[in-house]
Amino acid sequence: FWDIGFCTGSVSVEAKLQFPHLRITAFEKRPEGVGILSDNCRKFGTPGITAVTGDFMEVELHEYPTPDAVFIGGHGGRLVDILRKIDACLPPGCPIVFNSVSAASREMFKEGIRTIGRNVKETVCMTVDAHSPIEIIKAE
């Protein structure tokens, strides 16, 4: 499992809680994210998450286990480039999941998915209040 743009590591930690056997590689541009992830791993008892810091576009992905699924939480405005990069090393049918908080990022993801020849399979909208809808989009 790859968590791209992990921020606080909440998705990685939850994935590890749900599936303790899962090999998780979490990528984050900001160095301070590693400390936050480490604290959250200790707090929730989820050791074994590999944190990788730096610009994702410069990471040598072949150095990490091929994922069964990918979650993109942060993209720094380079979502389509990230999709192209991961598509080159993902197995066929590997799910790519993205959380979108804006119409612009939702459309950017959908366009990127089309660009790499994959299809959106499912969209779930979560709304806490009228001002904070989040769409979770799954593509394969």
Predicted regions: what they are:
Residues 1-7:
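Conserved class I S-adenosyl-L-methionine
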Residues 2, 25-28, 99:
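The conserved SAM/SAH-binding core of class I Rossmann-like methyltransferase domains
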Residues 8-21:
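Conserved SAM-binding loop of SAM-dependent methyltransferases across substrates and taxa
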Residues 27-67:
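S-adenosyl-L-methionine
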Residues 68-80, 100:
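A short SAM/SAH-binding and catalytic strip from SAM-dependent methyltransferases
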Residues 81-95:
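A short glycine-rich, Lys/Arg-flanked "PGG" loop and its adjoining helix->strand segment in the class I
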Residues 93-101, 105:
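Conserved beta-strand signature within the Rossmann-like core of class I S-adenosyl-L-methionine
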Residues 103-140:
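Active-site capping/gating segments
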